Design a protein with these regions (language model features):
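Active-site-proximal segment of zinc-dependent metalloprotease catalytic domains
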Residues: 1-118
């Protein structure tokens, strides 16, 4: 993996993505698995240069050369952030775009509703039937206990809401996209 200390201002995710795409292209040409999705973390310089995350596109079909980037740092004033880093949920959201995921439109007025098929009210993980929940397996080595996230109080990673987790809807769509990418790059059958 190459390291490139790129310094960008607040609205230059396009430059970050161009550099990430160049790194990806170089690595793919050197034998890296072409199904590999690339995401760049851009340090916010202690809040002085916050860069909005951005994917280079939202592909309709398998296209793992779509890259994305987003900020990392300690959030100052982000409601709902529980772990002192917004790199985790920002990364999940922008990578979701590289797998063809759109916004469910929640909170209203804060994001476009470009995924009209999103099945759960208010960008939640489940409807009132509570059929789905989020589950974090934790990490005993880091002292992180497993936990269950309520499907009606937690929101899908493609929203701009707090308390994010991946919904069954988004999970299944990304799982299918991964299968499609596997098929796209499968070796020819003799």
């Amino acid at each position: 993996m190459l390291w490139s200390p790129l310094v960008v201002g607040g609205a230059t995710a396009v430059l970050a993505n161009a550099q990430i795409a160049a790194i990806r292209n170089s690595e793919i040409n050197s034998g890296t698995d072409p199904r590999t999705h690339y995401y760049g973390l851009v340090d916010d310089a202690n809040g002085q240069h916050f860069m909005r995350g951005r994917a280079s596109g939202i592909p309709a079909g398998p296209q793992p050369d779509t890259v994305a980037s987003g900020p990392c740092g300690i959030p100052a004033g982000f409601a709902g952030d529980q772990d002192q880093s917004y790199a985790d949920w920002y990364g999940a959201h922008e990578l979701g775009h590289t797998y063809g995921r759109f916004h469910p439109g929640f909170p209203p007025g804060a994001q476009d509703a470009s995924d009209p098929a999103f099945p759960y009210a208010n960008g939640q993980l489940s409807n009132a039937d509570r059929k789905y929940v989020g589950y974090d397996v934790g990490d005993p080595q880091l002292g992180l206990e497993p936990k269950v996230m309520s499907g009606t109080t937690h929101h899908d990673v493609m929203t701009y809401a707090d308390r994010q987790w991946v919904s069954a809807y988004t999970f299944e769509a990304i799982r299918q996209r991964l299968a499609d990418e596997d098929a796209q790059f499968a070796p020819p059958v003799a």
